[in-house]
Amino acid sequence: MRLHATSLVAALAVAASLSIVSCAGGSGTTVVVTHPAVPKPTYVDKGDEGPSVGDERLWSFPGTGPGDTVVTIDWIMTTTGEDTPEKGVESRISSAVFSFGGSDTLLLQGVGLYPGDGATLKPSATVARAIVGGTGKYEGATGWVESTHNADDTWTHTFHID
């Protein structure tokens, strides 16, 4: 009986630890999307004339996902601060949808610091943003995405899905 009770306690401990790992989202899925240089955005001058808080940049362009999947990337970026944290730097919030064909999407959102005179990050710069959801096989996705503007002007977006 004592051996049976010890086995039962051990089994319950393993089950509890697996439940904790499951609740913590330990699946660790990584999805990588690449694309060439970002095309010129549609620029909407919403605030004061010229670069200012409220201005928007909008894009839609193709990328490549796992297994050479064609990915459509729709991106909205809004200026939220000028000369912050230093002169010549803008704070911008981005929302983007990465569509993997059909109903599979990953959504990101977050703030990055950008050169005031540029539409995108400088080459060799990286910014991290939150994964705020998804649809299809990515339904309810959470985690973070690391977007890197590579030195050759291409881009790599690495989604770290919990």
Language-model segments: what does each one mean?
Residues 1-9:
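Bacterial N-terminal signal peptides that target proteins for export
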Residues 4-5, 17-162:
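Targeting-peptide/extracellular-domain and disordered-appendage signature
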